[in-house]
């Protein structure tokens, strides 16, 4: 009779052992990694498998700072690397170091290449596939095409001044030459001796205010 309770106890112990889930390796998918970037953004990195046997892994990075929160996602097949298959922890730690050196974790590293799997090929690396920071303006962005510049206006003014100068030169070239009026020959005036005589006559016979007129008339009629 004692055999039956012992058999039941052994059976229950075996069932309890089978019901326990296997312990996950440290650094495998499902674990969270907390870190801080060079710009002091607080971030969390979460790797997750797409399914058993798929071999494809998604890596989610969520960050926040005093001004904003942002995120990005990476995709790859690190299981193709033998070092990752043996122990995934060094792979994720090296990916974490790459993100930690950035000012913003989702900008500046489109591909994560952990050194333990660098020779395994591009499929074993983590490629960034989406980010909330995509399309954000860069610091040294060029001015928009609609922004007017001052140089074309100066060029237009210079061109207009040049054209006005050309038009003025053409008008001067077409202008008719001006002819100077020919001087008419002057008639010979009365002789000096006649003038003196006319003045003398006018002084003798004319009233003082009209002496000049009288002298002129006397000289004119005497020729």
Swiss-Prot record:
The keyword Phosphoprotein does not apply. One of its GO terms (molecular function) is growth factor binding. Residues 125-144 have a biased composition (Polar residues). Its main location: secreted. Keywords: Disulfide bond, Growth factor binding, Secreted, Signal. It is found in: Secreted, Extracellular space. It comes from the Eukaryota. Residues 1-19 form the signal peptide. Disulfide bonds join 43-63, 72-106, 81-117, 206-214. Pfam families: FGF-BP1. InterPro entries: FGF1-bd. The keyword Signal applies. GO terms for cellular component: extracellular region. GO terms for biological process: cell-cell signaling. Residues 175-186 have a biased composition (Low complexity). Expressed in serum, peripheral leukocytes and cytotoxic T-lymphocytes, but not in granulocytes and monocytes (at protein level). Residues 23-45, 120-201 are annotated as: Disordered. Belongs to the fibroblast growth factor-binding protein family. This is Fibroblast growth factor-binding protein 2. It comes from Homo sapiens (Human).
């Amino acid at each position: 009779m004692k055999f039956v309770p012992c058999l039941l106890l052994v059976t229950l112990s075996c069932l309890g052992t089978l019901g326990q889930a296997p312990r996950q390796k440290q650094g495998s998918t499902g674990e969270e990694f907390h870190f801080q970037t060079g710009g002091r953004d607080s971030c969390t990195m979460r790797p997750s498998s797409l399914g058993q046997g798929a071999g494809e892994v998604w890596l989610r990075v969520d960050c926040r700072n005093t001004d904003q929160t942002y995120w990005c996602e990476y995709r790859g097949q690190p299981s193709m690397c033998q070092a990752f298959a043996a122990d995934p922890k060094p792979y994720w730690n090296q990916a974490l170091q790459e993100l930690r050196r950035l000012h913003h974790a989702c900008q500046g590293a489109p591909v994560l290449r952990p050194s333990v799997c660098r020779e395994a090929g591009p499929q074993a690396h983590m490629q960034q596939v989406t980010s909330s920071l995509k399309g954000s303006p860069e610091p040294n962005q060029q001015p928009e095409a609609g922004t007017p510049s001052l140089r074309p206006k100066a060029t237009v003014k210079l061109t207009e001044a040049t054209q006005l100068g050309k038009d003025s030169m053409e008008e001067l070239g077409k202008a008719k030459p001006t002819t100077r009026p020919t001087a008419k020959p002057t008639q010979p005036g009365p002789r000096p001796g006649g003038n003196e005589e006319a003045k003398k006559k006018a002084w003798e016979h004319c009233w003082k205010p009209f002496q000049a007129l009288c002298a002129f008339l006397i000289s004119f009629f005497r020729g």
